[in-house]
């Protein structure tokens, strides 16, 4: 005799799509752009990995592409809310009129994830963060991204 089992499987990955904004703590400039990332959970309740890319555009005709890999510790706040704290390296490619540069930075974030249905299929996120660039000038910035979460089964 076979019994039906209800198995709540976690998604294989979660895609984050949204918008982003950044503010320089050194010179006060701001930039805005899109945000895309994929998150996986190699160690349940202990480690989530997020790889993402964010192109940011400023009024001064400069573009900054940030590509990061974050190591996050997750906490489940309720069936519909999660919090993660993470750190990781970031590659920064900057294009300004007459100049191009590549540099390495460090990033720290808090990631708030909200799942309205409780089934973790679609939701939304809000992720404030701090960046420290190790290149000459040691740029520091605060950023925030937010948008849609899509679970990949």
Question: For the regions a protein language model found, what residue spans apply to each?
Answer:
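Outer-membrane beta-barrel domain signature
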Residues: 6-10, 21-28, 56-62, 95-101, ...
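Transmembrane beta-barrel architecture of outer-membrane proteins
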Residues: 14-16, 31-33, 64-68, 103-107, ...
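Solvent-exposed, flexible loop/coil residues
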Residues: 27-29, 81, 126
């Amino acid at each position: 005799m076979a019994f039906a089992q209800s198995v709540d499987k976690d998604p294989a990955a979660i895609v984050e799509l949204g918008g982003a904004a950044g503010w320089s703590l050194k010179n006060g400039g701001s930039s805005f752009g899109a945000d895309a990332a994929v998150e996986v959970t190699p160690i349940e309740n202990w480690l989530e990995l997020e790889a993402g890319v964010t192109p940011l555009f400023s009024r001064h005709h400069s573009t900054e592409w940030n590509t990061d890999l974050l190591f996050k510790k997750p906490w489940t706040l309720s069936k519909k809310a999660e919090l993660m704290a993470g750190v990781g390296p970031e590659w920064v490619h900057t294009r300004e009129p007459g100049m191009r540069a590549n540099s390495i930075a460090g990033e720290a974030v808090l990631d708030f994830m909200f799942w309205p249905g409780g089934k973790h299929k679609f939701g939304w996120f809000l992720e404030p963060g701090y960046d420290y660039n190790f290149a000459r000038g040691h740029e520091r910035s605060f950023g925030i991204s937010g948008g849609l979460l899509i679970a990949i089964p």
